[in-house]
Amino acid sequence: MLLELARWLQQLESLFGLFNYLTFRGILAALTALFLSLWMGPAVIRKLAQFKGGQPIRQDGPQTHFSKAGTPTMGGSLILLTVTLSVLLWGDLRNRYVWLVLAVMICFGAIGWYDDWIKIVRRDPNGLKSRWKYLLQSIFGLAAGLFLYYTADVPAAITFYIPMFKSIALPLVGVSFVVIAYFWIVGFSNAVNLTDGLDGLAIMPTVLVACALGVFAYASGNVVFAEYLKIPLIPGAGELIIICSAIAGAGLGFLWFNTYPAMVFMGDIGALSLGAVLGTIAVIVRQEMVLVIMGGVFVIETLSVIIQVASFKLTGKRVFRMAPIHHHFELKGWPEPRVIVRFWIISVVLVLIGLATLKVR
């Protein structure tokens, strides 16, 4: 929105040419989302509290969690609102990737909103039935995959790459591309949701991964950097740095209220949408495997649930005291802040490893 105005004003004053720089607009997007979150946060929390929007607590969960009963949830609505406003202000609205990612965020956010609403109204910790949730996620995930496949304008946009091995490039045709896109979008949507079980646990890794994906997006959309780093050149992908920056800013603003002890929970409206956005951006910039590395905390949390369920069904025994794995450490006696910060540290290390793949080719 403001980019178009700046382009017109540039004819009168060259200073407005700054808005043509992705990095400059990325910084503005992050700051806008951050300050909007800090400004709007208290009002949103008060409104959620008035709606009795408290998160139901698992009865079989750690005893320390019962003190969280009544804490407002659906705080992810603050993230979605501030990200959307920031992107509309500073993004290039002629870019199809911007609209796709916003659409994915809103659609998955709508699923999360309905899930949260059921939990609040019916006081049911399980929320929306899994089959309906996965059906809706599948519809939106497949739609995003089909859109990316049929709008791809360069071969690199539908090629699967393995990090650190520049010679390995697997062209994807039709169904194979859509299936991979589907699994990454829906998979990371649910992975972030599973991770969101402690105060601030999910949002900080999300911020870190978003920042790193912004670096990949910027490089992938730049001819010089893409050639130098030997990564796929995806025209238009650089604009995704605006969305990544907005997520980082909004995420930090939300963490101000979500840090231990949390004043508000993100809820499925935030977790499902942010995870889907990370997966979508990774698919666009062709860094699916790098996302698996950088989002390793989300992957580990998901695997812990899969292992726990499979083990119990096959042997009748549990591998962990409770899944997802962050609850396992809580039941081992780790204080909640220790679990959170240690998972953050792991996330920082994994993101740095992911960024290192830019040079290791």
From Swiss-Prot:
Record InterPro entries: Glycosyl_transferase_4, PNAcMuramoyl-5peptid_Trfase, PNAcMuramoyl-5peptid_Trfase_CS
Record EC number: 2.7.8.13
Enzyme class: transferase
GO molecular function per UniProt: metal ion binding; phospho-N-acetylmuramoyl-pentapeptide-transferase activity; UDP-N-acetylmuramoyl-L-alanyl-D-glutamyl-meso-2,6-diaminopimelyl-D-alanyl-D-alanine:undecaprenyl-phosphate transferase activity
Reactions it catalyzes: UDP-N-acetyl-alpha-D-muramoyl-L-alanyl-gamma-D-glutamyl-meso-2,6-diaminopimeloyl-D-alanyl-D-alanine + di-trans,octa-cis-undecaprenyl phosphate = di-trans,octa-cis-undecaprenyl diphospho-N-acetyl-alpha-D-muramoyl-L-alanyl-D-glutamyl-meso-2,6-diaminopimeloyl-D-alanyl-D-alanine + UMP
PANTHER family named in the record: PHOSPHO-N-ACETYLMURAMOYL-PENTAPEPTIDE-TRANSFERASE, PHOSPHO-N-ACETYLMURAMOYL-PENTAPEPTIDE-TRANSFERASE HOMOLOG
Family per similarity comment: Belongs to the glycosyltransferase 4 family. MraY subfamily.
UniProt protein name: Phospho-N-acetylmuramoyl-pentapeptide-transferase
